[in-house]
Amino acid sequence: MEQGAEDIPVVYLHDIKRQYSQGEATLTILDGAKLALWAGQSVALVAPSGSGKSTLLHIAGLLEHPDEGEVYVSGAATSALTDAERTQIRRTDIGFVYQSHRLLPEFTALENVMLPQMIRGLKRKETISRSKEILSYLGLADRITHRPSELSGGEQQRVAIARAVANAPRVLFADEPTGNLDPHTADYVFNALMQLVKATQVAMLIATHNMELAARMDRRVSLQDGVVVELE
């Protein structure tokens, strides 16, 4: 990508190819996939199970290497980066939310949100203040001392969202974030994500089967034969 371009996507996938061995066969999951994610824009990735949604998210989030192609973050190529450099980008620029909240059970809601900030090297006083602010924004001000087992499914997922945005990432990836929730709770969690996108101008890519939620996002894309296609 040209560094001098006026508008540069937060993340840009260029000609991504990813294959896996399946016995003696080779399974091609992504084959020349391209996708640009822009600041303040929400994108729904809607595709059948096994089509490569999670693989695409993992490659875009620098959790997995493509076999071919390039992942650009803020205009900079990442293929030649060391594992340590990729980890640093994930800590500062990328947030993840999964279908399962993946909160640490021995920590309170507040401590779970503080953790990524502490790992980044921020001072404890600062992390406490910011974590309380985010949890309050997500309607959890009275739940900060509760451990995950003491929270409802929707509350657990909102804590997971708070943790994902704790370091003010530039892009947020969510893999079926409402998949384990009832419709009412799913709607509440989805609205929380959308509010954060608009408030912080983070770019967001959500893999989802929920067409109703996908329809409320800025863009909708799918995977067909390993290629990203725009949907109406």
From Swiss-Prot:
EC id: 7.6.2.-
Gene Ontology cellular component annotations, sorted alphabetically: plasma membrane
Keyword RNA-binding: no
A Pfam family this chain is assigned to: ABC_tran
InterPro entries, per the entry: AAA+_ATPase (IPR003593), ABC_transporter-like_ATP-bd (IPR003439), ABC_transporter-like_CS (IPR017871), ABC_transpr_LolD-like (IPR015854), MacB-like_ATP-bd (IPR017911), P-loop_NTPase (IPR027417)
Top-level taxonomic group: Bacteria
UniProt-annotated binding residues for ATP: A47, P48, S49, G50, S51, G52, K53, S54
Subcellular location: Cell inner membrane
Native source organism of the sequence: Rhodopseudomonas palustris (strain ATCC BAA-98 / CGA009)
Chief location of this protein within or outside the cell: membrane
Gene this protein is translated from: lolD2
Entry protein name: Lipoprotein-releasing system ATP-binding protein LolD 2
Protein family according to the UniProt entry: Belongs to the ABC transporter superfamily. Lipoprotein translocase (TC 3.A.1.125) family.
Gene3D superfamilies per UniProt: P-loop containing nucleotide triphosphate hydrolases
